[in-house]
Design a protein with these regions (language model features):
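Active-site catalytic motif of lipid deacylating hydrolases and related acyltransferases
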Residues: 1-65, 113-123
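Glycine-rich, aromatic-lined ligand/substrate-binding cores of catalytic
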Residues: 151-168
Length: 168
């Protein structure tokens, strides 16, 4: 949740991946940071990422990509691998929410709190992150994000998009 590639300008900005992308580039790796909605369902984020993967493949001429996802980015990259396995060489999840989050469950259980948080996230925080990435078209939907992030949402996702990487 609330992921971004870079917010701000070079002189005054924040890199989500800190120095990882420049370090990989210095060592000869072609790297791209995706720009996807900071708050959305895994499938919506996955479709956004899939479009960018197709652009990277067209731009580089490489047949496959290696995807790295942090937090909600883990299930997001798994979605791409599930729907277009021919595009994916490898997946790496860092602190990924493959089995859901009890915090998401607790937030969803608190209707009043979720509604208030949704207003702030969907209309203030999410748009600020999207604008900060110079991509104000990225929409935010906290409820969809939390539902995907929840333990039940993760179980449904894992059944729909199975992987041998997760033990039963």
């Amino acid at each position: 949740m609330f992921g971004f590639s870079r917010v701000g300008v070079a002189e005054l900005g924040l890199d989500y991946w800190y120095q990882i992308l420049p370090a990989l580039a210095r060592n000869g790796t072609t790297t791209f940071a995706a720009q996807i909605s900071p708050l959305e369902s895994t499938e919506v984020r996955g479709e956004q990422l899939l479009q960018q993967v197709e652009e990277v493949i067209a731009l580089t001429g490489k047949p496959k990509v290696n995807l790295i996802g942090h937090s909600h980015g883990g299930p997001t990259i798994r979605y791409v691998e599930a729907v277009k396995p021919q595009y994916v060489a490898s997946l790496t999840g860092v602190g990924a929410t493959f089995r859901g989050s009890k915090v998401a469950d607790q937030l969803l259980a608190n209707q009043g709190g979720t509604q208030l948080l949704s207003l702030a996230a969907d209309y203030i925080i999410g748009p600020m992150l999207a604008y900060g990435q110079s991509n104000p078209a990225l929409k935010s939907n906290l409820t969809a994000s939390l539902t995907s992030f929840s333990e039940q949402g993760s179980r449904v996702f894992n059944q729909k998009y199975p992987t041998s990487a997760l033990a039963s």
